[in-house]
Amino acid sequence: MSMQKTNKTPLTLALIVAIGITGAASAAVHLSDDGQGQVLIYPYYTTRAGQDTYLSVLNSTALSKALRVRFNEGKNGREVLSLSVYLAPYDIWTAAVVNTADGAKLMTADKSCTAPALPVDGKSFVNFAYWGAAIEGIQKSGGDGATTSLDRTREGYFEIIEMGTITNTAINAAITHASGVPANCAVVQATTMDMGPASTLVMGGQSARAFKATGGLSGTASLVNVAGGTDFGYAPVVLEAFSPSLAENIWDYPGSIFPDLTFADLTSSVLYKGNVVSSTWNKGSDAISALLMHDSIINEYVLDDTTLSGTDWVITMPTKRYNVPVHDKEKGTDDDTQLLSPFTSKFWGRGSGSYNGACEQIANFWVPPDSWNREGGNYNGLGFPGDPFIGQRLCWETNVATFKDAQVLGSANAESVPVPFEHGWVRMLFNSVGIPVVNGQTDGNGVVHSQAAHSLTSVNGDTYFGLPTVGFMVQDFINQNAAPGVLATYGGNFNHKYTTRISRLPP
């Protein structure tokens, strides 16, 4: 065979040399370079504008896996549904997020074991994590000033985390398929089931504890609009060596808010200009931020009048919820909350302008994103003719930058981006500095800065510039010359390109 386990990519080899290991699975947490790993971050789900989101996760290994699947709404990253999924060797789990009269729900015809069991007619997303009176500070639940409506569940992002591998013979037999159906899902759905690192449960004469996560997970997602005839398919961002090397497993009970991205190894490895930057952190979510930090996003746009084309960019910041506190901005300086790097604004979901969400500036507030046409013509002035510029911000955890308000995805978290050309490309910069903030901005190394900036510094002094983002571009086209009665709508999507800057090496 032309592809073998012994073939190593440049990133894997660089990590092996830099960290002194014999296999990438023992390395610090890093981005996977082969599309498989322990954690999958899916930048976007939506049920808006006639779309449903179809998803899959594949276990390509000979080991059974315990997974945590978590859906987060897009405004402030609050959990709207989580469940455990148990995959037998070589198994795939598939599901869909679909629209309801009130919000969104998860449906599946897949037979793989979940805990809890999913109803035949699906499980509705809930608003428990953002319901009630506003609670100031960095919280996982409570009001945040934004709407408590279930409509908020209709778009966001989701993550799948490997909690561990299953070595218990009886549990393995229960989740393994026979004639297409697992033998006994009730085993893993029982309230007495405990596979955690402190478990004393014995089944079939063996400990029920899960063993270390080993990776080998991959996945897909598709934003499907049946009536519109479009399908925007994408692959998730994949993290490898997520679990700390000394952790036996990170399993937790169904319904728990854990594990999440804070459970990551406290050392991150990033390949930068041919060298591996290995940084140490006080919390796991900062290690994940380091992997995703970019000081600019680069991608294309198409706004062709003939084909009625439109372009949206999805931009999700999956570690924002760990660093941005809720604070009623109408209280002004009466503020006991603490903002954490690399974000520069606190969250309040009610109001207008900078009071709405936790807004991050795109480049200089008064200067639009740099834009080029297809012939290399550049425009980066103080405003586009016919498009008064008022400053672009990304205010939510999951954002949609919609070019000239094209609204391809119909997002409620959209920010319209003015551009001077019909076709071209944009470089969206994240380089804010000197942002006033009450109580300052606490950096990744514990230093409190009097003003906030788009940067994150590790315990060992590496500074990463920009914001931690994942996402992609979508564009649609309509063939107005197609035969009568023929649906002639087309769609395409493309991953963002990025620039990265780390202070350890020359910029």
Functional labels for PLM-detected ranges:
Residues 1-26:
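Gram-negative bacterial Sec-dependent N-terminal signal peptides
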Residues 85, 96-98, 102-507:
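Long, compositionally biased low-complexity segments
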